[in-house]
């Protein structure tokens, strides 16, 4: 066994760099935070080849004194804390004294700095070793150039993503810094091209416009809230302007960008029922608090923190956001419903969507599910006054369990289709071109009549109840999915071309993938200044073309892997949900045509969300319901 020995300073610096400097964006973050702590009002960042070739950060801050330059590049040397007490009262972004030493350990660093306007110093470090120091003319402030990142740790390079991805990570981190410090002017350039420029006039809305686009910034709501311990400020998107990812929520603590799941959930909770499922707001929320209430000494990146009075802060966030949104809405927030005690039920863990057609005289029935319900399923209360239906999954077949009130001891199991039919192999929501239409599994039904949103039909001796709205949704979904998979998606011209603004990050992603978007029927052209122009659109994007185009682009940007079949299924589902599908009285010809089309659909038994379309009632089932002897 090897003897215990002390590691060399060079090796310990490389180990520390592995925690602090994960990628080029980490270098940008650490250098910009140093500039902010130095009191800079102007920060310029330029990088080449995703930062691997060179990163330069220049500021007009306090600079580094000539006699302290060597110390600045020594591990655990800092001007920001001095005693143990300071560790629990941190008001700066940095404090660990690791950044410059860690950067120098894995790169070539040139620093030019001056703490006054009389003269400065220039130094070069290679792998933690100082190669040169000399006097140099320099205005007050610091300019640091980092080149050949990871030159002496090539294994780190294989863990980096593509050049485009690393570029986007740099843009994202500078965006967050700019949002946290609207009083500082940031300029970010890549290979000489400006990606972000803020004016430093302490105008958060203008900074959001520079990052996310003017169209979005103009519609954002002002957020204000306070308590004895916290002050909350920021801007929020309205509930109709959302994204499919939480990445557009920027949570700032005394100007520091942090990640905190519970606080993020509190922000989302503030929107209550105004948000559609799986949609998230765009929000910039800054929380000011006494540094004694937060511990930032948790992780080297300082993006994870521990908070005192976190529950109090969560409540303040949720309440403040709810009030800010309600001030600009005449619609009562569903958030208040969360405070109303629920009626006793044995299946509180399931979500209910109450059918608005249920008559006032319906008496609620408490019941117990016969098997463990699929937690992802939604349960709908029917218009029947004597039965509630619980949708469960059992051996890949749907079973409807009708349970009577407590005075009736018999139960009836109704199947939406003949249990002998084999429906295995169907995907829940994805249809491929090779799928076989299951026409033979649903018999030809004869229309009998309609009650509200339900059609009544028969085949032989059996009755069938068909949810009209769910049936139309199935047909609409199938049609849109077929259109998305056609070789040539028919287009309709816009009277006035639609100019779409994007965040700088999204613009760069979309600009490189314009050809891929054409496969989705979206033909965009570059319009410059973080904008793309749309001249034509698929007909099924009506009536709100812009909102639907943005939805498609949002889904495309946030897919984990490029799976176009899955993406098209998601798009078809979202478009179907956005189209207005209301129950209406059908004449017999229309009703019979609906039944015919449903029979020829990809799945006549459930819509694309898995909600039941049709229920079968045999004569035996009816006899049991009417308590007739078998």
From Swiss-Prot:
Gene Ontology terms for molecular function: ATP binding; ATP hydrolysis activity; ATP-dependent DNA damage sensor activity; mismatched DNA binding
InterPro entries named in the record: DNA_mismatch_repair_CS, DNA_mismatch_repair_MutL, DNA_mismatch_S5_2-like, HATPase_C_sf, MutL/Mlh/PMS, MutL/Mlh/Pms-like, MutL_C, MutL_C_dimsub
CDD domains: HATPase_MutL-MLH-PMS-like, MutL_Trans
A Pfam family it matches: DNA_mis_repair
Entry's Gene Ontology cellular component terms: mismatch repair complex
Taxonomic superkingdom: Bacteria
Keywords on record: DNA damage, DNA repair
Any one of the GO BP annotations: mismatch repair
Function: This protein is involved in the repair of mismatches in DNA. It is required for dam-dependent methyl-directed DNA mismatch repair. May act as a 'molecular matchmaker', a protein that promotes the formation of a stable complex between two or more DNA-binding proteins in an ATP-dependent manner without itself being part of a final effector complex.
PANTHER family on file: DNA MISMATCH REPAIR PROTEIN MLH, PMS, MUTL (PTHR10073), DNA MISMATCH REPAIR PROTEIN MLH1 (PTHR10073:SF12)
Family from the record: Belongs to the DNA mismatch repair MutL/HexB family.
Full protein name: DNA mismatch repair protein MutL
Native species: Lactobacillus gasseri (strain ATCC 33323 / DSM 20243 / BCRC 14619 / CIP 102991 / JCM 1131 / KCTC 3163 / NCIMB 11718 / NCTC 13722 / AM63)
Gene behind this protein: mutL
